[in-house]
Curated annotation (Swiss-Prot):
GO terms for molecular function: identical protein binding. Keywords: Acetylation, Cytoplasm, Cytoskeleton, Dynein, Microtubule, Motor protein, Transport. Transmembrane segments: none annotated. Homodimer. The cytoplasmic dynein 1 complex consists of two catalytic heavy chains (HCs) and a number of non-catalytic subunits presented by intermediate chains (ICs), light intermediate chains (LICs) and light chains (LCs); the composition seems to vary in respect to the IC, LIC and LC composition. The heavy chain homodimer serves as a scaffold for the probable homodimeric assembly of the respective non-catalytic subunits. The ICs and LICs bind directly to the HC dimer and the LCs assemble on the IC dimer. Interacts with DYNLRB2. Interacts with DYNC1I1 and DYNC1I2. This is Dynein light chain roadblock-type 1. Its main location: cytoplasm. The gene is Dynlrb1.
Length: 96
């Protein structure tokens, strides 16, 4: 667990990072650097989005899988690294 904490600290120290959320495969936040309402909102919305993106990738090619997802808007950028047991979600300001 110390390794996970170290990784989260390293990510959080990067310029522009607004928050980090670790979500289990059911969409339940395990760890977060954001407040509860924001964490819940991102966890719920991104969980559904990640599952749909993963399904789309597999539908195009059943031998393939989603390895990284990046969404960029005017206000922020959301990066997701899915794993078999959890999803790592990083929200950052793309202009910083």
């Amino acid at each position: 667990m110390a390794e996970v904490e170290e990784t989260l600290k390293r990510l959080q120290s990067q310029k522009g990072v607004q928050g980090i959320i670790v979500v289990n495969t059911e969409g339940i936040p395990i760890k977060s650097t954001m407040d509860n309402p924001t964490t819940t909102q991102y966890a719920n919305l991104m969980h559904n989005f990640i599952l749909k993106a993963r399904s789309t990738v597999r539908e195009i090619d059943p031998q393939n899988d989603l390895t990284f997802l990046r969404i960029r808007s005017k206000k922020n950028e959301i990066m997701v690294a899915p794993d078999k047991d959890y999803f790592l979600i990083v929200i950052q300001n793309p202009t910083e």
